[in-house]
């Protein structure tokens, strides 16, 4: 399980059915937490924290969730982080 997989899974589980902006926002929240000293410094560690995100390693994210995860650096900040 790689970092991209962890990010795509949480985007898929938290924001499937949401418009693209909602999916981007979920990814940005995760990345903001990775950058914060208050949270672990890896994507997988952030999304695996108890009671923070819907995260389940047995789920397979959609291709669209991978696309959102890969494209995060190219989107404007939607969450103020």
Which residues are covered by each model-predicted region?
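Bacterial extracytoplasmic/cell-wall-associated proteins, especially those involved in peptidoglycan
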Residues: 1-81
């Amino acid at each position: 399980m790689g970092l991209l997989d962890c990010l795509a899974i949480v985007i898929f589980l938290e924001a499937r059915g949401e418009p693209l902006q909602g999916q981007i926002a979920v990814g940005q929240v995760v990345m903001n937490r990775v950058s914060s000293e208050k949270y672990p410094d890896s994507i997988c560690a952030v999304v695996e924290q108890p009671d923070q995100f819907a995260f389940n390693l047995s789920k397979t994210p959609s291709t669209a969730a991978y696309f959102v995860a890969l494209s995060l650096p190219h989107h404007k900040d939607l969450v103020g982080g």
